[in-house]
Amino acid sequence: MMRALGYPRHISMENFRTPNFGLVSEVLLWLVKRYEPQTDIPSDTETEQDRVFFIKAIAQFMATKAHIKLNTKKLYQADGYAVKELLKITSVLYNAMKTKGMEGSNVGEEDISKFKFDLGSKIADLKAARQLASEITAKGASLYDLLGKEVELRELRTEAIARPLEINETEKVMRIAIKDILAQVQKTKDLLNNVASDEANLEAKIEKRKLELERNRKRLQTLQSVRPAFMDEYEKVEEELQKQYDVYLEKFRNLAYLEQQLEDHHRMEQERFEEAENTLRLMQNKLKEEEKRLLKSGSNDDSDIDIQEDDESDSELEDRRLSKPRTAMEVLMQGRPSKRIVGTMQGGDSDEDEDSEDSEMNMEDDEEDDDDLEDESIALSPAKPSRRVRKPEPLDESDNDF
């Protein structure tokens, strides 16, 4: 800013790290000359009194001429705080210079837009002018009325001034005023006396409270120093409670672990059961396809088998059909996991039990597969009408294959 204003020297904040009154006085004189070149301010700052007088003169000049209030203490310190005070003056000069430059650059634009104006601002100015005109009219009317009454008022005023004062009435009024003043003084004295008495009472109460506080403090210290009789029992109960809590935590963790193991076991059993069902379904589909293929191949051959043998084979197939579904259902019911769980809290034999159960399930699944294959072959064999007689060789071949 100082460079923009035309100050010849370069100024930085490093110059004000330590008090530098010479630089501050030089800058102040230059700024004052910028405001008013004909001003006469003494520049002597050798002694302390001269510096104080210089700072006061600068502050008074800026307050009267530029309406800028400066802090004389901060200026006298001549450090970083003085820079803030100097900025108050330089900012005003810098803003004035900027506005002047902007006005010079906008002269051509003002000539071009001379007849252009802001309609909104003009309307606001018009409203303000109308309000002021109405106020001026009202004030003028009231002033005219008062001036019309001035003749009568002048006569009354002169009569009141010329009338002699009665001493008795004046003394009476003065005595009444003196009595009122004396009553107020007495009231004030009473209040002061009451304040003194109240102060004494408050001091007495404060002393009493202090004594009670000291007494209670000593009592508290004695109570803290004495060990209660029930403290030993309390500590024992607390230790026992802590032990019970530890046992509870251990059992709770074991229970949570066992519940998780049970859920895992149920999930594994469900997965095995679903896998067995899927394998059975696949085998059934495969058997159906094989039976269809065998039926198609057997239908092309001639029937040379005796009717009696056909009847015997039909009866045997009926017996096998009735016996096999019952055994398959028993195997499936044995293969399903029981919902009742019997055991101890120890988990040492869980792996062996799971292995044995897995082996039993595998054996039962194999038996179920064989029974289902036989059932499918038996159920599909008598599907054709009795008019055609089939040879036994395809059935034997299908049983031997599976």
UniProtKB/Swiss-Prot annotation:
Coiled-coil positions: 187-297
Positions of the UniProt region annotated as Disordered: 292-402
InterPro entries in the cross-refs: Clusterin-associated_protein-1
Gene Ontology CC terms: centrosome; ciliary base; ciliary tip; cilium; intraciliary transport particle A; intraciliary transport particle B; microtubule organizing center; nucleus
Subcellular location: Cell projection, Cilium; Nucleus
Sites bearing Phosphoserine, chain numbering: S303, S313, S315, S398
GO biological process, one term: left/right pattern formation
Pfam families listed in its UniProt record: Cluap1
Principal subcellular localisation of the protein: other
Entry annotated with the keyword Phosphoprotein: yes
Disulfide cysteine pairs (residue numbers): none
Acidic residues bias spans: 301-317, 349-377
Keywords: Cell projection, Cilium, Cilium biogenesis/degradation, Coiled coil, Nucleus, Phosphoprotein
UniProt record similarity statement: Belongs to the CLUAP1 family.
Record's subunit section: Interacts with CLU/clusterin. Interacts with UBXN10; the interaction is direct.
Function: Required for cilia biogenesis. Appears to function within the multiple intraflagellar transport complex B (IFT-B). Key regulator of hedgehog signaling.
Protein name: Clusterin-associated protein 1
Name of the gene: Cluap1
